[in-house]
């Protein structure tokens, strides 16, 4: 019997460490329309905020990364900063899998809401969070958070605040 050439590679998820910060920086640069951050920022996301981030790898290659943090005034809310999925791993539901992996960690069992910002024309991100809301059996809403003119001085598209929740704890 011939090997199945359509078999998908195994993608492993883990809590990131500072050692993946440079790989995160490279991955995000290859995932437009994501805004690039400094490598230092990516190092902090991978270390200080590792409980609310996830790294996805095929072997030693980083193919996905989600960064987020708990909103200080509302620690039951995860703010998702960025979701990056490399070309090699697209179309496999990896973004949803990564978000659910963060929520399923014992340390995050009290998170019952997600917030993020999405530009109006980022269809992939809208589909991701609309699909996640369905999977979590909850509602989704949006409103302007940062306006193109008022906040970005016409240098960036308007960012819509997207709210998902409330939802029940996600099990591993």
Swiss-Prot record:
Keywords: Acyltransferase, Transferase. Optimum temperature is 20 degrees Celsius. Optimum pH is 9.5. This is L-2,4-diaminobutyric acid acetyltransferase. Gene3D superfamilies: 3.40.630.30. Pfam families: Acetyltransf_1. It comes from Methylotuvimicrobium alcaliphilum (strain DSM 19304 / NCIMB 14124 / VKM B-2133 / 20Z) (Methylomicrobium alcaliphilum). GO terms for molecular function: diaminobutyrate acetyltransferase activity.
């Amino acid at each position: 019997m011939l090997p199945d050439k359509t078999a998908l590679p195994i993608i492993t998820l883990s809590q990131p460490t500072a050692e993946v910060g440079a790989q995160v920086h490279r991955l995000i640069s290859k995932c437009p329309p994501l805004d690039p951050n400094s490598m230092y920022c990516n190092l902090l996301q991978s270390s200080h905020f590792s409980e609310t981030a996830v790294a996805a790898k095929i072997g030693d290659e980083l193919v996905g990364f989600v960064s987020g943090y708990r909103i200080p005034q509302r620690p039951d809310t995860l703010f998702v900063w960025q979701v990056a999925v490399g070309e090699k791993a697209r179309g496999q539901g990896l973004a949803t899998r990564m978000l659910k992996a963060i929520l399923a960690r014992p340390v995050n069992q009290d998170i019952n809401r997600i917030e993020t910002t999405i530009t109006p024309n980022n269809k992939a991100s809208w589909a991701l969070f609309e699909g996640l809301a369905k999977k979590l059996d909850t509602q989704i809403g949006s409103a302007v958070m940062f306006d193109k003119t008022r906040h970005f001085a016409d240098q960036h598209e308007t960012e819509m605040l997207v709210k998902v929740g409330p939802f029940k704890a996600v099990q591993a």
